[in-house]
Swiss-Prot record:
GO molecular function: 2-C-methyl-D-erythritol 2,4-cyclodiphosphate synthase activity; metal ion binding
Sorted UniProt keywords: Isoprene biosynthesis, Lyase, Metal-binding
Annotated residues for binding of a divalent metal cation: 9, 11, 43
HAMAP family named among the record's database cross-references: IspF
Pathway in which this enzyme or protein is active: Isoprenoid biosynthesis; isopentenyl diphosphate biosynthesis via DXP pathway; isopentenyl diphosphate from 1-deoxy-D-xylulose 5-phosphate: step 4/6
Subunit structure: Homotrimer.
Record-listed E.C. numbers: 4.6.1.12
Family matches, as Gene3D superfamilies: 2-C-methyl-D-erythritol 2,4-cyclodiphosphate synthase (3.30.1330.50)
Protein name: 2-C-methyl-D-erythritol 2,4-cyclodiphosphate synthase
Length: 157
């Protein structure tokens, strides 16, 4: 049996934080605000996986109110989700995702992101796809106020 899931996330830019996307630190003049490392791509992927599993969402599994998750690497959360998948005997077929940011361009970093995400999920990096997209200056991403990310995942059981 196959199950599909969708994930979406947004974080706003702030001064004085590192920019972490797909577990990779990207040199940029500002970072994303959030309780964890605010890795908007990994959060969208986690929500897509949880969606496919029928397991609510990232905020319910890892509450903002918990000090355990303050400034935590979102890759740690992704590994937790990988454990849940294993417990349920579910396997990821593939992940596709889009990061929407006017700047920075992410394509120089997507191979490293794919490797990190695949490692956490114990899958091949060829099962993970990451695309970058601008909005041609339109909307909050275009004004460089924040970054959004979309992900879909197919899992089989
Ligand atoms: O040309 P089109 O409108 O389809 O795409 P775009 O948003 O102008 O982006 C052009 C190319 O830049 C994309 O195909 C990506 O390869 C790259 N890109 C990126 O790496 N990171 C982003 N945040 C946005 C775009
Ligand atoms: Zn998030």
């Amino acid at each position: 049996m196959f199950k599909v899931g969708i994930g979406y996330d947004v974080h706003r830019f702030v001064e004085g934080r590192k920019l972490i996307l797909g577990g990779v630190e990207i040199p940029f003049e500002k970072g994303l605000l959030g309780h964890s490392d605010a890795d908007v791509l990994v959060h969208a992927i986690i929500d897509a996986i949880l969606g496919a599993m029928g397991e609510n969402d990232i905020g319910r599994l890892f509450p903002d109110s918990s000090p355990n998750y303050k400034d935590i690497s979102s890759l740690v959360l992704l590994k937790e989700v990988a454990k849940l998948l294993e417990e349920k005997n579910m396997k990821i077929v593939n992940i596709d995702s889009t990061v929407v940011s006017q700047r920075p361009k992410i394509s120089p970093y997507t191979n490293e992101m794919k490797n990190k995400i695949a490692d956490c999920l114990k899958i091949e990096s060829t099962q993970v796809n990451i695309k970058g997209k601008t909005t041609e200056g339109l909307g909050f991403e275009g004004r460089e106020e924040g970054i959004s990310a979309y992900a879909v995942v197919l899992i089989c059981e």
